[in-house]
């Protein structure tokens, strides 16, 4: 096993060294043989920014051979959102359900992939994998703070062959604030309902050879959930990032840059898995039970990346990054309730809240209505640490072949990540609504294991354009080795004498092909096919196979004046779908994957934007509409701890079949108003088919938001945002445990200052 990993590391590192050596050799040749010309002079910041992004602009997104969406800086500023869930609502094909109301840990699905903890998307920041351990433990309990992002990119379909390891649904790239090309400083702050405060500030500059930017985000709230007495239910987050870049001058014939990025973030949130009963949701949807008074989440995150860029006459560009991320978290939260002192009398909060009448003695302890001695409430310290590190490189080459154009991109990445679980349970008694520690656990008495992964990935993408036709063909390799070392709860010192080892390995070649043909100047059609992949986990009793699928899409784009329209149909045929045992999805929280088997996901995506008024008018009325239809079906019968009994024909849970988002704006002189409406149809919370039972669905709901911006001058802009204008108490999920509500009405005012 270890020899295989070493060979993989050597193979990956060798390829990267070859590419780097080629770049240095090419640089020397260039200096010796080519004089600087005006055609080769271009700003290095353009090279650096493009290397970190998948798209870079809405224009690029609208000219792919597959589906793509670019959330621009202007779009982010217009709506004023700090919640990634709301930022992505307008993107067709994106399926999101809320959990905490602030977007702290979003649940994002692309084209019907599993939404829980965004574990089936390739999540990146500046082109580098950002999930804590995307191969070993893909559930993204860390998500980059959307409030400090410059732009957000979403790729789906055959256009995402460069990005992995999750290639069925798509990729999301969070683009952080770039180093400016001149001195720039800014402050963006807001304050409002529930003592919610958000402040973001940055400072940056660029000189002939040196550039930098430093940014800081503070995000905090008292929270909109309350209990009796008034317990802490809020959160705070800090996030600081700095970038330092050395680069050649603009006059250099060959542009180079070396950039160092460092970041630290932490969080303390009083979040819980405890929801509400149906009866309590109907009368007090923002209530929190007393049994959750000890629940809290603490996290620390450190990121670092050293990136080298080189561009030869703007024809050959090579980007190489060395990166390391560390994430630690301890989610201390209620897990089980016990009546008496015996294990047989212990029940999970999920079970208790499913039927509060049958479980009345347990429910009374949860609410504090009944005193209980001994080990009445079991609170679990879900302490885990994650390491993620690697080296990646890509080379982009552009070539003119007569009247046609050829673009080649070759990339490789060696990546290693790990999750270290060292969890324990504490027991509390309940007296007069207050919890008191009865018995403290010891580290590792609930879970004590390490899961590690080593992966080598590479790809080749070719793009050929001639006249009105564009063809792309790509091939991706994913080779991953996963190792699990369970030291068991009986060996907290990890001596290894009781250790249970397991491993798994998967190697897949993933082809893709796309076509774009411009029928008329404003109208084009496109289609694509690619193979989907997701790495497997280590199963106890059998060697689990990776997730595999064949995915097809076709669509058309119309760009006529100020009218932009896109319509796409897709069909994902899974030969082997995988599910995960997540506590966030109602499972036991082992993170072990289970085999769903054959399944299909098909859907339709529509996007339209229009400026109906002439540009010469002082008043503008921008309109945008997006719609997503998603139909899922599993073809096998099986049982899992997370989903229970599943039958052929059942639909996947937590996927909206219908989702609609509409935006209307009013722009007049220095004033800008925007209204957003989103509608989500009924959504299943467990696998099923036919009519949805009320106890197993999230009912359809429509939520309206609004934002106002007044530009006092070029440096100062006043902002106001309203969330959930109708103050609708709407249900967002029935997991992790019990019913929970979305964000109620909130009003926030602030100012943006730019120097």
Please place each PLM-identified region on the residue numbering:
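Membrane-embedded beta-barrel scaffold of Gram-negative outer-membrane proteins
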Residues: 311, 317-323, 327-331, 335, ...
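Gram-negative outer-membrane beta-barrel transporters
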Residues: 401-402, 465, 571-573, 592-687, ...
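N-terminal periplasmic "start-of-domain" segments of outer-membrane beta-barrel proteins
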Residues: 46-79, 104-107
């Amino acid at each position: 096993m270890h020899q295989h990993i070493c060979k993989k590391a050597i193979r990956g590192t060798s390829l990267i060294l070859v590419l780097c050596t080629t770049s240095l050799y090419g640089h020397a040749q260039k200096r010796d043989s080519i004089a600087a010309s005006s055609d080769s002079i271009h700003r290095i910041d353009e090279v650096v920014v493009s290397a970190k992004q998948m798209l870079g602009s809405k224009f690029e997104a609208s000219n792919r051979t597959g589906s793509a969406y670019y959330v621009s800086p202007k779009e982010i500023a217009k709506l004023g959102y700090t919640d990634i869930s709301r930022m992505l609502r307008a993107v067709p094909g994106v399926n999101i359900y809320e959990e905490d109301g602030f977007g702290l840990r979003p649940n994002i699905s692309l084209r019907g992939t599993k939404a829980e903890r965004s574990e089936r998307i390739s999540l990146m920041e500046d082109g580098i994998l950002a999930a804590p351990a995307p191969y070993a433990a893909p559930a993204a309990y860390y998500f980059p703070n959307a409030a400090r992002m410059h732009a957000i990119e979403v790729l789906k379909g055959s256009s995402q062959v460069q990005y992995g390891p999750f290639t069925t649904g798509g990729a999301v790239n969070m683009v952080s604030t770039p180093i400016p090309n001149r001195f720039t400083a800014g402050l963006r702050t807001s304050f409002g309902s529930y003592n919610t405060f958000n402040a973001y500030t940055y400072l940056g500059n660029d000189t002939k050879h040196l550039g930098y930017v430093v940014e800081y985000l503070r995000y905090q709230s008292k929270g909109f959930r309350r209990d009796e007495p008034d317990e802490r239910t809020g959160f705070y987050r800090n996030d600081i990032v700095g970038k330092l870049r050395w680069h050649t001058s603009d006059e250099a014939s060959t542009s180079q840059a070396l950039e160092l990025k460092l970041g630290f973030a932490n969080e303390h949130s009083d979040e819980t898995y405890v929801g509400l009963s149906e009866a309590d949701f109907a009368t007090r949807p923002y209530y929190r039970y007393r049994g959750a008074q000890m629940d809290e989440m603490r996290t620390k995150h450190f990121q670092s990346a050293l990136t080298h860029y080189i561009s030869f006459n703007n024809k050959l560009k090579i980007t190489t990054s060395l990166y390391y991320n560390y994430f630690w978290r301890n989610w201390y939260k209620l897990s089980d309730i016990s009546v008496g002192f015996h294990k047989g009398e212990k029940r999970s909060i999920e079970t208790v809240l499913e039927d509060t009448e049958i479980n009345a003695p347990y429910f009374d302890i949860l609410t504090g209505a009944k005193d209980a001695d001994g080990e009445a409430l079991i609170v679990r310290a879900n302490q885990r640490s994650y390491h993620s590190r690697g080296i990646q490189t890509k080379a982009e080459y552009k070539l003119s072949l007569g009247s046609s154009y050829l673009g080649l991109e070759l990339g490789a990445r060696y990546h290693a990540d790990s999750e270290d679980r060292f969890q324990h349970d504490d027991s509390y008694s309940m007296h007069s609504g207050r919890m008191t520690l009865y018995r403290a656990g010891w580290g590792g008495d609930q879970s004590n294991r390490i899961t590690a992964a080593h992966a080598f990935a590479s790809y080749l993408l070719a793009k050929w354009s001639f006249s009105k036709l564009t063809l792309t063909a790509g091939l991706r390799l994913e080779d991953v080795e996963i190792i699990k070392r369970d030291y068991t709860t009986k060996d907290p010192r990890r001596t290894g004498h009781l250790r249970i080892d397991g491993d798994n390995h998967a190697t897949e070649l993933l082809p893709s092909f796309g076509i774009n043909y411009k029928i008329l100047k404003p109208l084009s059609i496109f289609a694509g096919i690619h193979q989907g992949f997701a790495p497997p986990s280590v199963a106890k009793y059998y060697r689990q196979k990776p997730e595999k699928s064949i995915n097809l899409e076709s669509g058309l784009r119309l760009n006529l004046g100020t009218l932009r329209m896109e319509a796409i149909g897709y069909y994902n045929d899974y030969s082997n779908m995988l599910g995960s045992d997540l506590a966030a999805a109602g499972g036991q929280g082992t993170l072990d994957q289970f085999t769903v088997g054959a399944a299909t996901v098909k859907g339709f995506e529509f996007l339209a934007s229009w400026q109906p008024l002439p540009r010469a008018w002082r008043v503008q009325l921008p309109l945008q509409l997006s719609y997503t239809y998603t139909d899922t079906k599993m073809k096998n019968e099986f049982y899992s701890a997370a989903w229970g009994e599943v039958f052929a024909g059942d639909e996947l849970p937590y996927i909206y079949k219908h989702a609609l988002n509409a935006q209307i704006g009013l722009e007049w002189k220095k004033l800008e108003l925007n209204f957003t409406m989103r509608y989500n149809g009924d959504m299943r919370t467990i696998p099923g088919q036919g009519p949805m039972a009320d106890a197993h669905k999230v009912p359809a709901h429509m939520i309206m938001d609004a934002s106002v911006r007044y530009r006092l001058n070029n440096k100062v802009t006043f902002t106001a945002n309203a969330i959930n204008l109708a103050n609708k108490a709407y249900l967002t999920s029935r997991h992790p445990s019990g019913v929970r509500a979305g964000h109620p009405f909130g009003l926030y005012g602030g100012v943006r200052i730019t120097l």
